[in-house]
Curated annotation (Swiss-Prot):
EC number: 3.1.3.-
Cofactor: Mg(2+)
Active site positions: 9, 11
Protein name per its UniProtKB record: 5'(3')-deoxyribonucleotidase
Organism phylogeny: Bacteria, Bacillati, Bacillota, Clostridia, Eubacteriales
Domain of life, per lineage: Bacteria
Length: 180
C-alpha cells in the first residue's frame, strides 16, 4: 500500500527565515524590529519607509538561505514521519535561491531525497494529502488537508487547523493518517 503524502513548506515552517530576515534587516537599517512586531504577511508594512519593498532584496542575497536555522523538533519530527508518509518539501520561491534552499535541505534533512523537493509558485497545483504551511494564502488553494504552522504574521488567521510547533504538527499528521 502506498503511503499518504505530506507536503511541508520550507520558509518559517522548517527554517527560521522570519528571525534571520528581521535580524539582517536590523543590521542594514539600524532598526530594532522583532519578529513578533510583524502581524501580517506583507513585511514591507513593518519596516522603515526607506526600506519598504527593498526588504525582499535580502532574500536574494547570495547564501542567505544557507545560514538559516531549523525550527525546534522539526528534524526529529520529519524523520519519524517518514515511516508513515512520503514527505515532500514544497517551497514557493524565487528561482535565484533554489540552489541555496536545496543545499540547505540536503544538509539539514539528508533523509529527504532531492526528488521530493518541489519549487513552485502556486501550491494549489501540488496534489498531496496534507500540507503544512505558515502562509494562509498557500492553504486557501490547496485541495487536501491543511495545517497552518504558527507564526507571528498569521496569529489572526482562524480558518485552518493550527500547529503551534513541530510537536503539534507531528501529532496532527499522525491523527490524520487513518483518514487518508
Amino acid at each position: 500500500m502506498n503511503k499518504p503524502t505530506l507536503g511541508i513548506d520550507l520558509d518559517t515552517t522548517l527554517n527560521t527565515l522570519d528571525r534571520e530576515w528581521v535580524k539582517r534587516y536590523n543590521e542594514i537599517y539600524k532598526d530594532k524590529l522583532l519578529p513578533s512586531d510583524i502581524k501580517g504577511w506583507d513585511i514591507e508594512n513593518y519596516v522603515k519607509p526607506e526600506c519598504g519593498k527593498k526588504i525582499y532584496d535580502i532574500l536574494k542575497e547570495p547564501h542567505f538561505f544557507r545560514n538559516l536555522g531549523v525550527q525546534p523538533f522539526a528534524e526529529t519530527a520529519l524523520e519519524e514521519l517518514t515511516s508513515i508518509f512520503n514527505i515532500y518539501i514544497v517551497s514557493a520561491t524565487h528561482y535565484k535561491v533554489c540552489e541555496d534552499k536545496g543545499n540547505w535541505i540536503k544538509e539539514k534533512f539528508p533523509f529527504i531525497s532531492y526528488q521530493n523537493i518541489i519549487f513552485c509558485h502556486n501550491k494549489g497545483l501540488v496534489h498531496l494529502d496534507i500540507l503544512i504551511d505558515d502562509n494562509p494564502l498557500n492553504l486557501e488553494n490547496f485541495k487536501g488537508n491543511k495545517i497552518l504552522f504558527d507564526a507571528h504574521h498569521n496569529k489572526s488567521e482562524n480558518r485552518f487547523v493550527r500547529a503551534r510547533d513541530w510537536y503539534e504538527a507531528k501529532a496532527l499528521c499522525e491523527s490524520l493518517k487513518d483518514f487518508l
